[in-house]
């Protein structure tokens, strides 16, 4: 900024002091053209402006280097965070696969247990059905036996009542009494 202002002052002074002519020509007179003055002014500008310009450039260089260092540090931190995030992602994927495999294994175990329980229930029901059928068969057979026995007794009584006369009844009673006496005699001895 300082240099720019100095150059501007120099040109404004030069324009005020040098008349602008209608034609263009090269003046070779060193004193008239103020080449010495211009050389001195340029030398002063270079001498004093060099320090200012080099300071400005050095400051700019330091700012740029600092910005680059900060950017590199941010990049390294971001790269480290990215690496950690990728590692966590891989761990999460492994854990998800492990959970999925465990879930499938658990599902298969439960499926087998349900099939086994259903088979056992089916066997128990089949056995219960067979027991019930056997029980009902036994009961039906027993009922048939009882009915057959009752009918046989009824027919026997009917036959006895029809064929029994008082003489036959007396002989049967005497026969049974004789049998009882024989049994008593055997048991007493």
Curated annotation (Swiss-Prot):
It is found in: Plastid, Chloroplast thylakoid membrane. Pfam families: ATP-synt_B. GO terms for cellular component: chloroplast thylakoid membrane; proton-transporting ATP synthase complex. The chain crosses the membrane at residues 35-57. Keywords: ATP synthesis, CF(0), Chloroplast, Hydrogen ion transport, Ion transport, Membrane, Plastid, Thylakoid, Transmembrane, Transmembrane helix, Transport. It comes from the Eukaryota. It is a single-pass membrane protein. One of its GO terms (molecular function) is proton-transporting ATP synthase activity, rotational mechanism. InterPro entries: ATP_synth_b/b'su_bac/chlpt. NCBIfam families: PRK07352.1. F(1)F(0) ATP synthase produces ATP from ADP in the presence of a proton or sodium gradient. F-type ATPases consist of two structural domains, F(1) containing the extramembraneous catalytic core and F(0) containing the membrane proton channel, linked together by a central stalk and a peripheral stalk. During catalysis, ATP synthesis in the catalytic domain of F(1) is coupled via a rotary mechanism of the central stalk subunits to proton translocation. HAMAP family: ATP_synth_b_bprime. In plastids the F-type ATPase is also known as CF(1)CF(0). F-type ATPases have 2 components, F(1) - the catalytic core - and F(0) - the membrane proton channel. F(1) has five subunits: alpha(3), beta(3), gamma(1), delta(1), epsilon(1). F(0) has four main subunits: a(1), b(1), b'(1) and c(10-14). The alpha and beta chains form an alternating ring which encloses part of the gamma chain. F(1) is attached to F(0) by a central stalk formed by the gamma and epsilon chains, while a peripheral stalk is formed by the delta, b and b' chains. This is ATP synthase subunit b, chloroplastic. It comes from Chaetosphaeridium globosum. The lineage of its organism: Eukaryota, Viridiplantae, Streptophyta, Coleochaetophyceae, Coleochaetales.
């Amino acid at each position: 900024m300082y240099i720019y202002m100095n150059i501007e002052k120099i040109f404004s002074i030069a324009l005020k002091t040098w008349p602008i002519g209608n034609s263009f020509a090269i003046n070779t007179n060193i004193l008239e053209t103020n080449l010495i003055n211009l050389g001195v002014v340029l030398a002063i500008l270079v001498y004093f402006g060099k320090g200012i310009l080099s300071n400005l450039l050095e400051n700019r260089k330091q700012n740029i280097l600092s910005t680059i260092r900060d950017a590199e540090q941010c990049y390294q931190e971001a790269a480290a965070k990215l690496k950690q995030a990728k590692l966590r992602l891989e761990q999460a994927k492994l854990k998800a696969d492990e959970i999925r495999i465990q879930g499938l294994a658990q599902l298969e175990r439960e499926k087998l247990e349900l099939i086994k329980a259903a088979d056992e229930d089916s066997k128990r029901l089949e056995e219960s059905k067979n027991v019930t059928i056997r029980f009902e068969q036994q009961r039906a057979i027993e009922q048939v036996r009882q009915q057959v026995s009752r009918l046989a007794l009824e027919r026997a009584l009917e036959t006895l009542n029809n064929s029994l006369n008082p003489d036959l009844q007396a002989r049967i009673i005497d026969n049974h009494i004789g049998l009882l006496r024989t049994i008593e005699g055997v048991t007493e001895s």
